[in-house]
Amino acid sequence: MYSPKRVKLNLTNGMRKRPETEENRGELYPPTAMARNGISPYFIGKPRRKIVGDHKASEAGPPPPFPLKPKRKEPDDDPESIVIDEDDEEDEPAPQVEKREPKKTHNRPFFGEKSSLTATELETAKKEEVVKKKDPFTMRGFDFGSDEKVVKIRDKICDIVDPTGARRSDPAFIQQMHSNTLKGIEVATNPKFKQKRTANNKNRAAIGSTLGTIYPNFLTASGQEPQKSKFQIPLDRQSSSQSNHSQPIRKTLPEIPRRCSNSLVKKAMGMDTDGGGKDERMDGLRSEPTLKHFDENIISLIESEIMSVNNQIGWADVAGLEGAKKALKEIVVLPFQRPDIFTGLRAPPKGVLLFGPPGTGKTMIGRCVASQAQATFFNISASSLTSKWVGEGEKLVRALFSVARLKLPSVIFIDEIDSLLSARSESEHESSRRIKTEFLVQLDGVNTAPDERLLVLGATNRPQELDEAARRRFQKRLYIALPEPDSRTQIVENLLRGTRHEITDHNLEKIRRLTDGYSGADMRQLCTEAAMGPIREIGDQIATINKDDIRAVTVADFTEAARVVRPTVDDSQLDAYAAWDKKFGCLPPPL
């Protein structure tokens, strides 16, 4: 058994030399020893060991487990020797290796400058290389006919092409299916396939019609014939490809500049809103210098609160409340109609407060003001001016008044204003306090012009909970009390206009006595209940009876309805409203 020689390893072969000591001076680096012996799993090269003389295998050790091939003959080399690059140290004898013929494999042989193949094999490989250069796809004609997936796909295609199965036994049909499969695989594996597809229109048409050529009876899932392309040819290309006598189907649209505004694009495409209202308003508001520091979502939220009054409500529709209607005409309608007269001391107040028990018509008066004032009407609630983000509520209040001042004359109606401007205390949250402060500053502050036509109309059921600073800014505080007897009679007449009834003046007097203490909402509920009296008498005949056969509403229906509908306002609450009106109200008591 011979001991392999110790070699110096450099950094080019991926290993470092083990440092020499007295203990390991006679040892060899383990990977090197394994590589020299030919048993290393990482060794993929061929040993190049110099054979010296006729040493026997017993003296030099066993032969390596792989064959050694003679190197190409060079001028200075022995034709039967194999050389390994080592140091200048003395070589130890290596075993003689018997010459073995290389094993033939099915893989393609490697050939190059230092090939160990025979001349016949080299000639055969060169011929294959020449054939490959001429037609590089001859070696890719693999037969996948027996593959399981290909068989399944072929069966599905056969079911489509031959659903009855009559041609399954035809050898020509089977051969066609097999050849089509191989042809499709060969086309798909061709790297020039995409280049051929995009070469020209003729090639596209040829490739698009491949399916129809292979399967002439093929139909799509919808039962239609396959189309070559689902995209329409542009008009300029189509017109150029046709004759000069053919005219285009439609005119081409002019090219729109990139910097064109969205509103112009929408109008050109016929997608603008009715009159361009909201988009034009939003674009106009964006250009205002006073709104540039507001976010777009804040301006959009305020714009959404602008109320468009479709149903015209007149002062005659509001029963009673003559003092409140007269005061509102002087405050809202007349100054907006003649702003040149109402200047200086005649300038209308900035804030009007409507207070009273629930159901007395405060909200309806606000709708009437919006209809009669011909002004921009903002219908605001407490939720419109609050946000979960800190500082967002103050911005909403400031944006509300900024937009209202840009759209003068304006009316801001806030229902249930006590939830927004309640009395400030130490226990309330800081954000709520800031919103109230901002509202009061915007309503009557340093930047408020004395002659601007901006009115804040508030309605509340709890005036005693308002902050004292807010109470001062509402110069006109109008008490909307319960309807008087004559007002209740007028409410009944107004509600019965579209219903058949037999109510006379004598019956109205009786209804007036029955409804003492009723509010306007209670009177409406009473009339609704009385109108359902004739319907309840019909019973199951409601599906077949004629509309004209339903009897009219009588005073008996009101009497029966009065037993169900009761007044909702307590007398103690009325006393509290009367006391607050006596202390802070601005309407003189009725004569």
From Swiss-Prot:
Database matches in Pfam families: AAA, AAA_lid_3, Vps4_C
Gene Ontology BP, a term: cell division
GO MF, one annotated term: ATP hydrolysis activity
Composition-biased stretches (Polar residues): 237-249
Main subcellular localisation: nucleus
Family that this chain belongs to: Belongs to the AAA ATPase family.
Subcellular location: Nucleus
Protein name: Fidgetin-like protein 1
PANTHER family assigned to the protein according to its UniProt record, in alphabetical order: AAA DOMAIN-CONTAINING, FIDGETIN-LIKE PROTEIN 1
Stretches the record annotates as Disordered: 1-117, 223-249
Ligand binding (ATP): 319, 359-364
Cofactors, names only: Mg(2+)
SMART domains: AAA
Keyword Glycoprotein: no
Organism: Caenorhabditis briggsae
Gene3D superfamilies membership: 1.10.8.60, P-loop containing nucleotide triphosphate hydrolases
Transmembrane segments annotated in the record for this chain: none
Subunit text: Hexamer.
Function: Has a role in spindle assembly which acts in the progression through mitosis during embryogenesis. Required for fertility.
Gene that specifies this protein: figl-1
GO cellular component, one term: nucleus
Annotated Acidic residues bias: 76-93
Taxonomy, superkingdom: Eukaryota
Keyword Metal-binding: yes
UniProt biased composition (Basic and acidic residues): 17-26
Keywords from the UniProt entry: ATP-binding, Cell cycle, Cell division, Hydrolase, Magnesium, Metal-binding, Mitosis, Nucleotide-binding, Nucleus
InterPro entries recorded: AAA+_ATPase (IPR003593), AAA_lid_3 (IPR041569), ATPase_AAA_core (IPR003959), ATPase_AAA_CS (IPR003960), FIGNL1_ATPase (IPR047858), MT-severing_AAA_ATPase (IPR050304), P-loop_NTPase (IPR027417), Spast_Vps4_C (IPR015415)
